[in-house]
């Protein structure tokens, strides 16, 4: 085996025949792989022709490393060779490496080749061609080719295209990623959430955790139709997407709901809210991350199989529902989670770590909670897990349907801030009375009307 020092020394000798001999395809695969993998940066004038015979080597790793090293040279003389190789190669990773090598040349002669790549059947190959063509911003031929991807049948290609086109067109956000406006911190707003949204700036909150109101489960007059209900939630969660910081999370607790029958001549109807909302959420820009199942004890379930228990007739079985969905989404971003982590100082990351025992599966067994002031409340444990798993200390946690305010209370417990909206005055009053008498939360929050919330944001009272 050649040492790294020996390889580096030979690279600097333009008259050396070392690489022509050392990279002969007759050598053992392990020898070739070691040499190709340790070449590092190649000097100007390096003879890239030594790699060409290896493009037809039977070992796919050797072919891939050979084409990668050709790409380091950024030499147009290899354009035709690489184009032919990319068209004939069967391994996806190696084809992508060849297309990447073509793109690194930054030669306009490569545009027709890369344009042809966009018609490939492999989405990963198309994606690589897209990235390569983005280097030719402003070139009419390249722009025209890229525009064809707007309606590409593969959703990942469409998403990649949209991310690339909008990467430089995002609005400038005044506060940094880890910060939020002081006027939004620890505030309960008693108002219609859709009116409240008109006052909240873009990219203001770090995490949203909420459970929407049930569809007409208790009052038939709340929503005109199930579609109207879904449209309402869609509007709310689209605005939630707008005010969420880049790459941050939205967690939705929902479950199928039963609407009682309107007469003895009709049957009750069950609506699959989380499943009906899912495509709407992904369409508006939320990326699906996880489906967590909240499992409640059987005694907490409404009995739906009493009749079947008595007569055992087929077709009449109805299971007692002991689960609810906790759907986890992330605001789509071209940045990875690592980028989000780097927006915080080391101390914040360290102190926000989840050090206690935690549930490793997506099945969370948690007892339900009750509250005399609200008919449907989050268990503290459920909110605690979500807030710890998907936010840092000092983050702003949002709940557009605050109810009894569990999200806000637990946010404070974990040294986060909260922003809550609740339109029912009696629920807001319940929060104010309960928290105001607690030794844990005295004077740590504001209860504001919509008008006062606007004044709080603008500083004009």
List each model region and its residues.
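S-adenosyl-L-methionine
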Residues: 172-196, 436-461
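Alpha-helical adaptor scaffolds
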Residues: 60-100, 112
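Alpha-helix N-cap/helix-start positions at coil->helix boundaries
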Residues: 28-30, 45, 60-61, 76, ...
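Eukaryotic acidic, Ser/Thr-rich intrinsically disordered low-complexity regions
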Residues: 147-174
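Alpha-solenoid HEAT/ARM repeat scaffold
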Residues: 17, 29-33, 37, 49, ...
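Core catalytic lobe of class I
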Residues: 97, 122-124, 128, 182, ...
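Amphipathic alpha-helical scaffolding segments comprising HEAT/armadillo-like alpha-solenoid repeats
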Residues: 9-24, 43-56, 75-88, 107-119, ...
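Structural signature of alpha-helical solenoid repeat scaffolds
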Residues: 40, 71, 103, 134-135, ...
């Amino acid at each position: 085996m050649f040492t790294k020092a020996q390889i580096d020394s030979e690279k600097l000798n333009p008259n050396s025949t070392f690489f022509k001999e050392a990279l002969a395809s007759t050598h053992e695969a392990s020898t070739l792989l070691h040499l190709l993998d340790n070449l590092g940066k190649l000097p100007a004038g390096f003879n890239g022709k030594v790699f060409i015979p290896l493009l037809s080597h039977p070992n796919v790793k050797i072919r891939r490393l050979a084409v990668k090293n050709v790409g380091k040279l950024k030499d147009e003389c290899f354009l035709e060779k690489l184009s032919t190789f990319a068209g004939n190669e069967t391994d996806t990773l190696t084809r992508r490496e060849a297309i990447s090598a073509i793109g690194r040349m930054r030669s306009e002669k490569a545009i027709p080749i890369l344009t042809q790549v966009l018609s490939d059947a492999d989405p990963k190959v198309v994606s690589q061609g897209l990235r390569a063509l983005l280097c030719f911003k402003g070139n009419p031929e390249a722009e025209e080719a890229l525009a064809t991807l707007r309606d590409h049948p593969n959703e990942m290609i469409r998403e990649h295209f949209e991310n690339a086109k909008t990467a430089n067109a995002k609005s400038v956000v005044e506060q940094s990623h880890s910060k939020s406006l002081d006027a939004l911190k620890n505030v309960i707003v008693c108002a219609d959430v859709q009116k409240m949204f008109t006052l909240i700036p873009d990219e203001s909150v770090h995490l949203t955790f909420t459970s929407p109101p049930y569809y007409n489960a208790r009052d038939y007059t709340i929503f005109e139709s199930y579609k109207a209900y879904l449209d309402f939630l869609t509007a709310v969660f689209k605005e939630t997407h707008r005010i969420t910081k880049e790459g941050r999370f939205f967690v939705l607790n929902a479950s199928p709901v039963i609407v009682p029958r309107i007469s003895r001549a009709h049957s009750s109807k069950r609506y699959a809210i989380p499943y009906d909302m899912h495509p709407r959420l992904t369409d508006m820009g939320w990326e699906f991350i996880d489906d967590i199942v909240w499992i409640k004890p059987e005694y907490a379930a409404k009995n739906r199989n009493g009749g079947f228990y008595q007569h055992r007739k087929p077709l009449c079985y109805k299971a007692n529902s002991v689960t609810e969905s906790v759907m986890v989404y992330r605001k789509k971003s071209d940045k990875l989670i690592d980028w989000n982590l780097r927006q915080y100082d080391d101390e914040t990351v360290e102190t926000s770590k989840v050090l206690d025992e935690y549930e490793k599966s997506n099945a969370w067994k948690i007892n339900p909670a009750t509250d005399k002031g609200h008919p449907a409340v989050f268990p503290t444990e459920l909110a605690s897990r979500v807030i710890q798993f998907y936010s840092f200390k000092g983050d702003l946690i949002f709940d557009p349907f605050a109810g009894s305010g569990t999200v806000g209370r637990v946010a404070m417990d974990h040294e986060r801030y909260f922003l809550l909206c609740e339109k029912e005055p009696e629920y807001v009053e319940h929060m104010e009375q309960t928290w105001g008498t607690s030794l844990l939360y005295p004077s740590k929050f504001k209860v504001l009307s919509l008008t006062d919330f606007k004044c709080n944001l603008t500083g004009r009272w």
